[in-house]
């Protein structure tokens, strides 16, 4: 298995982020407005670079020769340290789905949120038709907390939004908690 490296999202990742978000297999499962433009994403990045209520990351694999490949972009948004909660999101390279990358990213983000940020709860939203993601979230300890009916306009139609959450105590019970070996490497 190649080495996995995580670092904060950087400007150099934005072109790839735009390509992934504009991929039908990605935007079909998310409630984002498309097309996503590079100029708009650069503006978003500049506005949010120092925003302390979010933490965006990029996951890479590194082969034996040292070459790096982006495999996922993910993060915690709406970080609320007073109420000790944050929303989680994950986008896997569309060419690399089904390889456990999403699971690794979810586990790493939970570990980061609960260990580093001392969160009480991590939650996320998904659309009902994204059953693959729902299965992943349930396997990693998330619980379906409810369904927000006709909550968002998705691909021209109003659709429900599923709300999943995991509490700190539930995370502490997860067997994978101590097995997640991905480490954050922050350039100095």
Locate each region found by the language model.
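Acetyl-CoA-dependent GNAT
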Residues: 34-97, 167-169, 181-185
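Conserved acetyl-CoA-binding loop-helix of GNAT-fold acetyltransferases
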Residues: 98-112, 131-139
